[in-house]
Amino acid sequence: MSDSSELVMVAMSGGVDSSVTAMLLLEQGYNVAGVSLQLKSNNEPYGNGYNLKLINRAREVAAALNIPHYVVDLSDIFSQRVIADFCQQYSQGRTPNPCIRCNYYVKIGALLNKIQDFKADYLATGHYARIVSDENGTHLLRGADGKKDQSYFLYTLPPESLSRLMFPLGQKYKKDIVRLATNMKLPVSQKESQDVCFIPDGDYKSFLATRMGFTPGKILDTTGKILGEHQGLPLYTVGQRQGLGLASNEKLFVSDMNADANTITVAGHDQLYTSRILLSNFIWRESGIPLDTSGMIVKVRYKAAPAEVKKISQSGDFYILELASPVWAATPGQAAVIYLDDMVLGGGIIESGGDTI
């Protein structure tokens, strides 16, 4: 049992994971309070009340657990750091991962500062990831449940943040969490969280259309030949095949998008493989990038199969990742996260891929 004088604030959405997180901490003897995030400002059209539904559901769970529940307004920083960047990235023909920025700036970054107002000792979330401390520092590890592991979305968190965080589900499996919630009759939603919480209906086109114009442009092949016309860069992503409107005997995929020229380049499936990736905003969590990359792997998307890392080298403000075997459709704007066994070593944002890097 823990020291009951330690206050742990649990980021609660009313879902299974955060609700069981609060319950487990109570069982461990912590003084627990729930906190939900107000992320939608009154002048924002997105969400259709989705954020309010989450807050109300979290309040019901907190009442069932007999713990205090608070709401903190982080709508300004969410709008500035997450939504504005999301739109800007899409306008440049990139495919961002807003969850990574949200964790760093909002759900964990800003919330860690806010809970100081409540004199809280720790912030706990329902992420499936682990935190381990030893003589070499504090480390971020994969969650035990490989199918639910969320360490990919947390790779930017600094060690000083990890030291004030708890991930009680890190050693758990999703099926067991659902069973616990059912047995305790917690008033939770069994639905999985939305990929992008501020677009709960998944209609990216409508969301982006309220914030930017779509300018049609040319679709080219790799020789520069015009094959057709696209409807606007934000509507496409590297690796996309559907919706191109091209008549071709060959299956063609988006291989590159040039925001300056407002063009999309398409190529055959095999031409999207690359074993060299250029990364920006590179972060290395451990002490020094070793010359020996034996055992290191990288994920170039959350659901991507891992690829073996051959070499990591610096090129000005960027880093070049060389892989032992090629990956398909390394997408600008997505994160490439590097692991050694279960430990998150670092990562960066994909700028481009190809042998000419």
UniProtKB/Swiss-Prot annotation:
Signal peptide: none annotated. The record marks 127, 334 as: Interaction with tRNA. Its main location: cytoplasm. Keywords: ATP-binding, Cytoplasm, Disulfide bond, Nucleotide-binding, RNA-binding, Transferase, tRNA processing, tRNA-binding. Residues 148-150, 301-302 are annotated as: Interaction with tRNA. InterPro entries: MnmA-like, MnmA-like_C, MnmA-like_central, MnmA-like_central_sf, Rossmann-like_a/b/a_fold. Disulfide bonds join 102-197. It holds the Pfam family tRNA_Me_trans. The keyword Methyltransferase does not apply. Gene3D superfamilies: Adenine nucleotide alpha hydrolases-like domains (2.30.30.280), HUPs (3.40.50.620), Translation factors (2.40.30.10). ATP binds at residues 11-18, 37, 126. GO terms for biological process: tRNA wobble position uridine thiolation. GO terms for molecular function: ATP binding; tRNA binding; tRNA-uridine 2-sulfurtransferase activity. The active site is at residues 102, 197. One of its GO terms (cellular component) is cytoplasm. It catalyses: S-sulfanyl-L-cysteinyl-[protein] + uridine(34) in tRNA + AH2 + ATP = 2-thiouridine(34) in tRNA + L-cysteinyl-[protein] + A + AMP + diphosphate + H(+). It is an enzyme of class 2 (transferase). Its EC number is 2.8.1.13. It is found in: Cytoplasm. Catalyzes the 2-thiolation of uridine at the wobble position (U34) of tRNA, leading to the formation of s(2)U34. HAMAP family: tRNA_thiouridyl_MnmA. PANTHER family: MITOCHONDRIAL TRNA-SPECIFIC 2-THIOURIDYLASE 1, TRNA 5-METHYLAMINOMETHYL-2-THIOURIDYLATE -METHYLTRANSFERASE. Belongs to the MnmA/TRMU family. This is tRNA-specific 2-thiouridylase MnmA. It comes from Dehalococcoides mccartyi (strain ATCC BAA-2100 / JCM 16839 / KCTC 5957 / BAV1).
